[in-house]
Amino acid sequence: MSATGLSPVRCAFVLLLALCSRPASGQDCSGQCQCAAGKRRACPAGVSLVLDGCGCCRLCAKQLGELCTERDPCDPHKGLFCDFGSPANRKIGVCTAKDGAPCVFGGTVYRSGESFQSSCKYQCTCLDGAVGCVPLCSMDVRLPSPDCPFPRRVKLPGKCCEEWVCDEPKDHTVVGPALAAYRLEDTFGPDPTMMRANCLVQTTEWSACSKTCGMGISTRVTNDNAFCRLEKQSRLCMVRPCEADLEENIKKGKKCIRTPKISKPVKFELSGCTSVKTYRAKFCGVCTDGRCCTPHRTTTLPVEFKCPDGEVMKKSMMFIKTCACHYNCPGDNDIFESLYYRKMYGDMA
């Protein structure tokens, strides 16, 4: 049959095959790398910043169900890959999840690799049966200052995220009781009453690790810098490895193992990247009587990670010196454990 005799449906099918078989725009990697100049690209919450397929530029990874090419890869941290299907010469595919267990969250079933908003405050991703969430609202901390001695977060009508407001002082000095509300623990660091070049140096405590096992995040806020400006500092933290069966190490007649001994040095992993060095790190143990064990004294050290694409990044990380076992544990149903604080006697760095 001649081309002119094709039905409209067959014409559309032939056109679709032609589009899927031709190379995607900008697919050629033979030329020199040309990346957009300026600031480092910012991706939406929960979307990874990855190296493109040509090994040139960093871009926001494609998500589940989105179109992808060899140059525009899918998000590897969510177990996604670009499924080109058939015929074999197709250059455009669809981001598909590798085989993994689905997740049940709030009565809804999500596929492995699927992202969703659990509420207006959190963006979540299902990955092989586990749900991980990142906050969509600002997690900043505002320290007391002369122009705002009593800051507090409030829920405003029509808005999802809480915002900071400044209350008027009520028979308090600027620094005393107001500052105490933000120092939930003693710290080895700058003296909060120290004046330096017209700057009242203030540093909050490190928050508890966002995860009870595996790699998490701990944060604090300080103005201990040359410009006396508030800045948020973060560090990686690992209270204990998730795969470790620590209960079997509890001695007979005891109910806790506070700081178990790790038999061999370990390498830390972060988003597919591995620490360059091995570390003989300390971790917190477990109890069989309902208590939980958390870091008591810590220090912060830089750790270098090497990624599969060759990039080397340096991150600050918490290293445990001592642990304490106690009954002040987070709730069993608290999936956002980053909101949980346990008193720690400071960072010794």
From Swiss-Prot:
Residues 1-26 form the signal peptide. Its main location: secreted. Residues 198-243 form the TSP type-1 domain. Residues 27-98 form the IGFBP N-terminal domain. GO terms for cellular component: extracellular matrix; extracellular space. Residues 247-349 are annotated as: Heparin-binding. It comes from the Eukaryota. Keywords: Cell adhesion, Disulfide bond, DNA synthesis, Extracellular matrix, Heparin-binding, Secreted, Signal. This is CCN family member 2. It comes from Sus scrofa (Pig). The gene is CCN2.
